[in-house]
């Protein structure tokens, strides 16, 4: 009887250790995935700030892309980037 109880307790201890290991691994993967997503967001934000695209709001600190020009268009109450009738060179 003592051997059976000892075996059950030992099995529960092994399962607890394995469960803790899987949980730690899952948490590490989750943190790594979250970090990767934040890196991708930061890269896309930096890319988006280089210039404003067609119909994007523009100011002195937010310039339009090379083939666009910043203009005031009524009834919109702010400046937008519109096409300057040129084509970007590739």
Swiss-Prot record:
GO terms for molecular function: ion channel inhibitor activity; toxin activity. InterPro entries: Huwentoxin-1 (IPR011696). Residues 1-19 form the signal peptide. It is found in: Secreted. Pfam families: Toxin_12. Residues 20-50 form a propeptide. Keywords: Disulfide bond, Ion channel impairing toxin, Knottin, Secreted, Signal, Toxin. It comes from the Eukaryota. Disulfide bonds join 51-65, 58-70, 64-81. Its main location: secreted. Expressed by the venom gland. Coiled coil: none annotated. Belongs to the neurotoxin 10 (Hwtx-1) family. 13 (Hntx-13) subfamily. The presence of a 'disulfide through disulfide knot' structurally defines this protein as a knottin. Ion channel inhibitor. This is U7-theraphotoxin-Hhn1a 6. It comes from Cyriopagopus hainanus.
């Amino acid at each position: 009887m003592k051997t059976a109880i000892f075996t059950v307790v030992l099995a529960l201890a092994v399962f607890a250790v394995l469960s803790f290991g899987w949980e730690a691994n899952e948490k590490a993967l989750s943190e790594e995935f979250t970090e990767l997503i934040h890196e991708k967001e930061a890269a896309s934000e930096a890319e988006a700030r280089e210039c404003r695209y067609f119909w994007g709001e523009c100011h002195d600190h937010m310039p339009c892309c090379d083939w666009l020009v910043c203009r005031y268009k009524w009834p919109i109450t702010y400046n937008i980037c519109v096409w300057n009738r040129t084509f970007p060179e590739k």
